[in-house]
Structures are given as structure tokens and as C-alpha cells.
């Protein structure tokens, strides 16, 4: 049985695709759950929805999953500028959920993450993470009494959600893949050392990675003042053990890195996008140095059985465009795809 930790309310009001973070005219309820996955694995799941509303149709429920390094709660529910991505959607009438897979944030961390990395093998593979998503989807569908929900993944999360959707089309309404992972033109060096159970990142390294590929004259105004520190403070706080190190670090499972070596860097797809048979949106930004545009383009061409598909490329954005100055462009495209009526081919001949 899932355990409900607590529930709180916060205020938000919307106007079109805009928002007012300080307004209290409309309420948002937030609940946190512990959801079982594989034996011994407990997942942290968070939900936000309009206060007092308990019934949602399949088309108004969305689940987020994070990428390879940072947890979902500080990716999708960090109130930069006064409102998080979850807040913005909940204020529009959505029942929005996130899940942190094993090894991240408040979900169960494998025991080897409490030892030096070299003493263990890479933990949290894409297959394991997909089972965690499956557990979260089943929990949400049972709780809401629906057969399908919408899914969105970021970075490695696109592989998790893509793999899940390709094998569970009947449970997916629409699919959003933000910075999709696909076959890389890079390869694994022949002298690459074996991977440990997990890796660590520092605050300085995180900022350097964020800005990689950004023109020097564009760096200063890419991330609004205070947003990086707000995000970094919240993100590194999700790993109390790492925070005790000097300097403080964030621990991240290496299963994703091992899968990259075994599949994406070896020219072998981990799954086939052609098996996805639900409407799909790809979101990507031009300065994404982690998963460059060529991967999105190649992935888009593989979506041969989606009823309809769309690819939106954002200018002046990185792998983390969702937390940058152009985040409302991102939100506009996300909400537009999720809320539009299913496009149909017109029978009228063009004039």
C-alpha cells in the first residue's frame, strides 16, 4: 500500500498561459506518497492538483520523470520566478505527478551508494528505472480510476518513458520527450575504466556543465539572477550524505552511464521508437551539449507509428531550458500539445 505523507495548500492564479505566483485566489493541493516498486524499493512520488478537485479525466493527468543526475522534485517542482512547472499545470486544472526512481532523492538508494563507488557495480539501470515508472503509473491509474495517463521524461528520462511507452502503449495518452536520448556519434574510449556504483558532482561542475556550448556573450542573461543558486541549494539538499562531504557533492547512480556505454555509445538502441504508437512531442534547445540536436532529429525520424508527432526546437536554451529565461516558451509548447484536441486531417481541399 502507498503511504500518504502529508498535504499542503499554496496559491496560484492563471491568466491564459501566464501566472501570478503571489496571488492566493486559487489553491493547489500537494500530496506526497511512498509507492512500492521491486521488493525492497520504495519510491518518492509527489502530486499537485487544484484544491478540492478529486476527479480527473485521462487527458488531464501527467507524470514527470527526471534525468540521469538530478531528482524530479527540483527539476519539475522548483518555483523559480514564483511557480514551478507543476504549479503552472496544476493551476490550469491538471493532476500533475512526479516520481524519483531508485537511487535518487527520497526514493530507496541501493546499499552500495553508502560505500565508496569502486566497491560496487553501476546501480539503477534504465530497465530498473522503467519498472519504477511502471509502479508509479499503476498507482496513479488505480488512484484515479483511469486506464491511461500522459507521460513526460527529461534527458535519460526520455529513455525511461520511451521504453515504457513502447511496451505499454495501452496505458499512455500522450508522450512528451524533453531532450531525447538517441544513438551518439561518440564512442567509449578503449581505455575507459570500469564504472563504479555511482558518481558524484559538485556545485561548480554542475554550473560548468549547464553552460557548456553557450556563446560567451549569452551566458550572463541565460539563467535569471538567483535561479541557479535556488536550484542548486534545493538539489544538493536532496542528498544529505553527499552534503556532508567536502566539498559537498550530489551522488547519482551509474546505471545510466553503463547503459550509455552498452547501447547509445555502441550504436545499439535500447528500444525502438517505432514501437511507440501514441501522440508524441519532442522538445529540445539549440545549445544542448549533453544530447545535441542531431539526436533529436534522428529520433524524430524513428517515430514511424505515432499517430502524430511534433518536434519543437527552442532558440537560446540549453539542456536545462526549462529552468532558464525562455522557460515560458517551453511551457507554452508543453501545455499546447497536452491540451489541444487531437488534430485530424481536413477533408477540404486547399484553396
Spans of features found by a protein language model:
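Conserved alpha/beta-hydrolase "acid-adjacent" motif
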Residues: 289-295
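Short, surface-exposed "cap/lid" segments of acyl-processing enzymes
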Residues: 52-98
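N-terminal cap/lid segment of alpha/beta-hydrolase-fold proteins
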Residues: 26-57
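Conserved acidic catalytic loop of the alpha/beta-hydrolase fold
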Residues: 128-148
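Alpha/beta-hydrolase
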Residues: 186-281
